[in-house]
Every structure is written in structure tokens, then in C-alpha cells.
């Protein structure tokens, strides 16, 4: 919104030309979201506490968590408010990628809100029925995946519709441009053609998988938000490079017109995340809830698909991956051993993985900071693929 105003005024007031720089608007989006979060935080926390949306704590988990019972949850609303207001102010609202990421973020956030609401208001520990949650996640994920299959290689929505029409006329046999290929990190100009169905399936898995992986990681004070900020910032760097024809050519990446604007969203997500961390750091005054975790994970997955960095997301989000795998292995092994031995056995003391380390003697803050350190290292590895090719 401010960009349109600045472009209208820049002929008379030259200093407004600074708004044309994505880097400037990304910084301002970060600061704006941070200030909104810090200012609105106390009010949001008071409202959540007044509504008695307190977090229920598992009695079979670490006993140190019992004191957290009743702490307001659904604090992810604070993050989403900061992101959306900041993006509306600083992003180019004619950019199709900004809108698809915001739609996915809002959609997953809405699913998470319903899940949280049922848990804390209706006192239903299961929350939203798993089938219902999966249905809505699938609907949102497929919508984004199908749109991006025809959007990543084009410059505007008219071209997107034309490509989609060509695909229909070809009897679903049209090949996508090379820009939609799966990029292999650390490999110079090596990519794997996915085809339209392959692109849609992979994109769906990345978007929905990332959403659920971030949600599983959200279990300790401050644990998930810092990795989200770090991975989001790195994806913002990839978006800036691949949205710039000169940098993309120099670094041997496909040029994706409009992708650079996602740096604004990543900046807003980082600023809103830091503001949330201010209130979520141990001992937490508020928890993120599914409304925040599902939304942020979906946003990361969608951005990774747009900038063709699905594998790099897998690397940089290694903590999310490890947490998810720990849950899958625990459930699988429990069911297998129960079937064969009559009682379920466990691989980990408790899943997700962060609880395993807690029950092993690590303090909560030790788990959190060490997971942050691991994420920093993984993000540096991911960023190195910008040049090491």
C-alpha cells in the first residue's frame, strides 16, 4: 500500500524512490511487525487470559511442565496480526506470490484456530477431528500447489491462465518450463524435471508437511519460533536472489519474476516472530498454539516451493524434520510391538524428540538453545548452496 503511494509521490518528492528497493521495504516490514507485536502483546495476552484459553499440559510428560497449565495459548494470533498488517503496508500488493503465501498462511492459521478453540473452549483434548483437519490442510495445500504449478514460471496471472488453458487443450500432456524443475543444491545447473503432476504432488507434500512439522516442534518455551525466523530469513535471501535477473544469472539460479517480493513477507515474519519470542521466552507468558504453528509452517513450505528450494528447506529445517520423524517412528514401533508382543514399546522416552531429551536430564532451556544452535548451523549450510555449486 505504501509502495503505491510512494510511486505516486516520487516524481515530486525524490526521497520516496527508496520505497522501490525491496531491501528497504523488507527492513521496514521487519521493524513494523516487531513494533506491532511488542505493542499489542500485553493486550492480546490479557484478552486470551480473560477468555480462559489456557494450555492443557500432558500429565505423562516432564513434571516441570505442570506449572505451565493454564498459560494462555493461541498466541500465534499475535504473530499473524503483525505479518498481515506489515505486508499490507510494505509489500507490492499487485504481486501474486505475496497473496498466495498470505492465503496459505491465513488458511492454515484458521484450521489451527478451530483446533485450538475446540481444545481450550470445549475442553476437547483431541481438538479438531484428525480427518477434518487433514481434509482442510489438503484442500489448502492442493490449491496452492496447483496454482504454483502454473505460476512459478510466468510473470502475471494472465500468463498463468494462458498456461493452464494450454495444458487443458493439450490433454494434460503439456510439459512445464524448466524453471519448475526440482533444483539439486550444491550442483551446478543440475535439476530434475517433475512434470505438472509431480510438481503438484511434491509441492503439496512440502506445504502440508512443513505445516505439521513446525506444529510438532512447538512444545517448549521459545523452541519453534527461532528456527522459523532463521529458516524464513534464509528463504528470504533465496527469494531476493531468484527474483533478481542479474543475481540469479550470476549464481546460476532460474530467474523467477516477482519472487523477490517474498523478502517482505519473510521480514514481516521475522519481526513478528521476534516480538512473540519476547513474550514466549522461558517462562512463557503465552503459547503459540496451532493457529501460529500450522500457519508459519505452511508459509515456509509455500515460499520454499516458489523459490524452488524444497531440498534446502529440508536441510535448514532439520529440527522440524527430526521432530516429525521421531513421532512417526515412535507411533510405528509402538503399533508393531503391540501387535507382536501384546504391549507397545517405545524407541524414545517420549515423542516429539525434545521431550526425549528433557526426560533424559536436559533442562528445558538447554534443549531450546541447543536446538537453536543446530538450526543456525543447518541454515548456514543451506545458505552456502547459494555459491557452492
UniProtKB/Swiss-Prot annotation:
CDD domains xref list: GT_MraY (cd06852)
GO MF entry, a single one: phospho-N-acetylmuramoyl-pentapeptide-transferase activity
Cellular component, GO annotation: plasma membrane
CC cofactor: Mg(2+)
Keyword annotations from UniProtKB, A to Z: Cell cycle, Cell division, Cell inner membrane, Cell membrane, Cell shape, Cell wall biogenesis/degradation, Magnesium, Membrane, Metal-binding, Peptidoglycan synthesis, Transferase, Transmembrane, Transmembrane helix
Stored Pfam families: Glycos_transf_4, MraY_sig1
Intracellular or extracellular location(s): Cell inner membrane
GO aspect biological process, one term: cell division
Family: Belongs to the glycosyltransferase 4 family. MraY subfamily.
NCBIfam families given in the database record: mraY (TIGR00445)
Protein name: Phospho-N-acetylmuramoyl-pentapeptide-transferase
Source species taxonomy: Bacteria, Pseudomonadati, Pseudomonadota, Betaproteobacteria, Burkholderiales
Protein encoded by which gene: mraY
